[in-house]
Amino acid sequence: MRFSLITATLGRVEEVRCLCVSLSKQTFKDFELYIVDQNEHHELEDIVRNFEKNFIIHYIRSDVKGLSYNRNIALRMCKGEIIGFPDDDCYYEVNVLQEVNEAFSSREEVGFCAVTTRDTVTKRVCHISQKAYLYKKDVLKACISYNIFVRKNTVMFDERLGVGTYFSSGEETDYLYSFIENYRTCGFFVDRTAVYHPANNADISKVYKYSLGFAALQKKDWIMRRNYKAL
């Protein structure tokens, strides 16, 4: 199966290079990377030129700021059977795509996979699941955008949620909720590899923004999906 990996980026250069280095070392080679560049500068173009000989890169410039909006640009274009959303400041262990591919290939009933995450500095585990199979109630604890992979589908990100909007978070949880309910599917947790990402610093401004996103997510889940258990 081919992977389509989508990275919407703003304000980072060396971190994107680090991500590309990790992708160039993947043991599983059938993938493409979509970089949606929201920067006013063109520094990422050098990185694209340096790595496009190693794997397929689609470079897209966007004048609109917003994580969900720009992920949706790439979602409309991607060709792979499996979609992933690596952040512009994360990187993969060398066997991430291999392990995820094997998980999907051996479990036709699974619609999405989540991978263990570790902090880039301390290497401590941040997201893990003691359960092999994941359901909607497990998403908040086990899943975050950069550790999830989904079978190709028609669900799009809610552009009212996520970084660059008033509700600065919750977009990946909302995406998975919609995917699980629309396709009546479950997930599988892959614990034999890891994605590395800086641990979030819980400063007041971030907590406030994340709280707004979480509140919006819960309200949407209650009203639109009639999930009264969320209250």
Predicted regions and their residues:
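Catalytic core of nucleotide-sugar-dependent glycosyltransferases
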Residues: 203-228
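Acidic donor-binding loop at a coil-to-helix junction in glycosyltransferase catalytic cores
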Residues: 163-175
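Glycine-rich, basic loop-to-helix element that forms the pyrophosphate-binding segment
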Residues: 62-78
